[in-house]
């Protein structure tokens, strides 16, 4: 990819995204981002060849995400940065969870476009204390803001950046630790069909626990990949 031009106009697509709304409060961001757009603005905004578009927008239909990314390509912007999720790592294991599946499909579309890059985020929180118990692939709001202000991409032709780290959080009780371990065994026993545990996920959610479902599987796979 050629070097950046002297001037780059930063544009955010997805101003309603919760993550972006939190990032927007970080020091320096308001001055750095010239425009923030919603879905409805995509077809009427005047993009320029000097634009770098940070895509926080997400649609549940894969074709809508593809249309959005191809519209940016057709607009002739300098660079598209698609914000994706660490949960896409589970795609080689199962496709039964909607969110990771759709994000993975959009990530593939983004990487098929020559001017696009992909930024992979973990569980996004303002502070580590907000993470679920256990080992988490996590990214702080402040870390995303710093990256947006001074992007550092991998050298060479690599266009995918993983911006996360593993963070260990304590369990609320020995009982929760036991439940976490047992849930993991059940999840792995389900093989490519972990969504069989969805009734149990609803129970865990009602109890205020947040480490179930694709969050558990994603954290497990990232933990393995970073220690192998």
Regions found by a protein language model. Give the residues of each.
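N-terminal Rossmann NAD(P)H-binding glycine-rich loop of SDR-like oxidoreductase domains
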Residues: 4-31
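SDR active-site strand-loop-helix element
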Residues: 13, 56, 80-86, 119-121
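NAD(P)H-binding glycine-rich loop region in Rossmannoid oxidoreductase-like domains
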Residues: 40-75, 86-94
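Flexible, glycine-rich beta-alpha linker
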Residues: 89-91, 117-140, 171
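The catalytic Tyr-centered alpha-helix of NAD(P)H-dependent dehydrogenases
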Residues: 94-102, 136-141
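Active-site Tyr-X1-5-Lys
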Residues: 97-120
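Alpha-helical substrate-binding/gating segment
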Residues: 137-178, 187
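Terminal hydrophobic/aromatic helix or amphipathic segment near a protein terminus
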Residues: 167-218, 222, 227
């Amino acid at each position: 990819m050629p070097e950046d031009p002297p001037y780059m106009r930063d544009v955010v697509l997805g101003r309603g995204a919760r993550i972006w709304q939190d990032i927007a409060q970080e020091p320096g961001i308001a001055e750095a981002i010239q425009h923030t757009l919603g879905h409805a603005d995509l077809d009427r905004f005047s993009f320029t060849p000097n634009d770098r578009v940070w895509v926080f927008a997400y649609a549940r239909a894969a074709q809508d995400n593809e249309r959005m990314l191809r519209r940016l390509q057709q607009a002739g912007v300098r660079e598209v940065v698609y914000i994706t999720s660490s949960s896409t790592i589970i795609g080689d294991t199962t496709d039964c969870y909607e969110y990771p599946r759709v994000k993975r499909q959009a990530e593939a579309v983004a990487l098929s476009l020559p001017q696009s890059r992909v930024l992979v985020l973990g569980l996004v929180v303002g502070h580590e204390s907000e993470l679920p118990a256990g080992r988490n692939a996590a990214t702080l709001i402040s870390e995303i803001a710093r990256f947006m202000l001074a992007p550092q991409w991998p050298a060479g032709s690599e266009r995918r950046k993983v911006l996360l780290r593993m963070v260990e959080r304590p369990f609320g009780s020995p009982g929760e630790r036991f439940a976490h371990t047992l849930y993991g065994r059940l999840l792995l026993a389900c093989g490519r069909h972990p969504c069989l545990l969805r009734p149990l996920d609803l129970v865990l959610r009602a109890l205020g626990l947040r480490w179930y479902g694709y969050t558990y599987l994603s954290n497990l796979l990232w933990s393995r990949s970073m220690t192998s």
